[in-house]
């Protein structure tokens, strides 16, 4: 890539087309010591992969809200214990020279498990435990799957503007509160 050939992109240009979470996911999809080729097709693949993970998290939240039973059944406890294998694979990948590509593969294995081993008859405890497990793995990679916890850039910009207005009005107590 070079600027003179016209195949050079800045993060700002990429962020106009793709969410920065997609860019993060794209960059994590390769080992940090491997070269990373940028293309629109690869960014779209990263976008669909990230959406797959977020969709699984959203599905778990939906099922938690409509769960008919609270406590985990014995069969669910056995299934949940099997899902620990994916956590082990994730941790092994991260211990193997920060192999994020393999770690993401373990997350996808967990997503596949979630999609096949949960339904509207699953208990709330089972669903919550799987959700916590998914969030724990994705948070290590800096991927936000729980949109309720995500602070939007527009919210931050609004708070900055409000703080600047309070400082102009010499309302320092309010400016400090916003900070």
Q: What does each of the following model-derived ranges do?
A:
Residues 2, 6-179:
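Structural preference for alpha-helix termini/caps and helix-kink/transition segments
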